[in-house]
Amino acid sequence: MAKSTRPFYTAKEINELRSAAQFYKLDAPTEFWRRVASELKYVCNGAGPDRWSELKRRALTDALKMYEPAFAIHDVEYEYRLGTQRKSDRRLKKNMIKIWRKNFGFWRWFSRAGRIERLVVIPTVYAAVAIGGGQAWEDAANE
């Protein structure tokens, strides 16, 4: 959600996230593609809720860098309240799995890092947004 007058991303970075979303063939609402990058740079804020400091969100986003395009799509869905929170959160998980598959390839289940990403990281992120995202979803409704 656009609470800050200071953007988290530049317009160029938003376009790079869009390119990555195309590369990974992520599922995204029309708003993600239709809105101008200069607007979305205030909407997309990386991983974590708006109520967190930028420092915390940057740290988490850096730790989960591979999934950044999925987070940008999720931010757009929350900001414009597209569909339902549950549908948005499920799309985030599906998009993270697409990224995981592409990055770890055929050997994804044979690599320890691949298994950790799929069995720990992705479910943890999904649980966090499914449980804690309600407040952010409501905040978007009240703006």
Model-derived features: positions:
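Extended terminal accessory/targeting regions
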Residues: 1-143
